[in-house]
């Protein structure tokens, strides 16, 4: 009976640890990209199409005159830059709305970062940025916060790729240890 209790305690421990590590990686807030430079964006190789859906928060102003640009890419230096997505005549980035953009750029692997650039007086607030790319799963970046003026602001999970490998190795070890306890517990029960 004690081994069964130990077994369930270990399962709970592994679940709690893996969930807290996962949440800390996924829920990092957006940040100012101090070293991000658009002039470093590559325009070499094949061209691929991307669908970018930017939803504006219901907390944002009713409409915006702000100039909005987006840059995104993968962990291998493949970057896409789209200047001036805003267009007041077509009512882009209105409060509680979603705007879809077709953007062409270098082909990438899995998108792992996105930055928005805002310039203007209105203080636009994006809700989410969702990017669909060729051959990769769609990725959503949850903003729901004010984008500071005249800085690149967003998410960079590219450096987390190695963290996910560490997490996978750690979980694999936990499963092996857990299986060891199961075998030991089963042996004790026999």
From Swiss-Prot:
Signal peptide: 1-24
GO CC aspect terms: extracellular region; plant-type vacuole; plastid
Keyword field contains Signal: yes
Location (main, coarse): secreted
Known tissue expression: Expressed in roots, rosette leaves, stems, cauline leaves and flowers.
Glycosylation site list: 37
Subunit and interaction comment: Interacts with EULS3 (via N-terminus).
Role this protein plays: May play a role during embryo development.
Record's protein name: Embryo-specific protein ATS3B
The species this protein was found in: Arabidopsis thaliana (Mouse-ear cress)
Taxonomy of the source species: Eukaryota, Viridiplantae, Streptophyta, Embryophyta, Tracheophyta
Name of the coding gene: ATS3B
């Amino acid at each position: 009976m004690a081994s069964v209790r130990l077994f369930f305690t270990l399962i709970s421990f592994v679940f709690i640890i893996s969930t807290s590590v996962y949440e800390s990686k996924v829920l990092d807030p957006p940040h100012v990209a101090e070293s991000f430079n658009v002039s470093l964006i590559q325009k070499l190789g094949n061209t691929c199409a991307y669908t970018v859906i930017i939803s504006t928060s219901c907390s944002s102003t009713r409409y915006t005159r702000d100039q909005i640009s987006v840059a995104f890419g993968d962990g291998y230096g493949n970057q896409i830059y789209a200047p001036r997505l805003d267009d007041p005549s077509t009512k882009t980035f209105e409060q509680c709305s979603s705007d879809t953009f077709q953007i062409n750029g270098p082909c990438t692997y899995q998108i792992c970062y996105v930055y928005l650039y805002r310039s203007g007086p209105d203080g636009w607030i994006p809700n989410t940025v969702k990017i669909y790319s060729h051959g990769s799963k769609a990725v959503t970046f949850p903003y729901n916060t004010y984008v500071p003026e005249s800085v690149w602001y967003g998410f960079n999970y590219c450096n987390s790729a190695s963290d996910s490998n560490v997490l996978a190795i750690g979980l694999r070890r936990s499963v092996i240890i857990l299986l060891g306890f199961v075998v030991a517990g089963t042996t004790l029960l026999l």
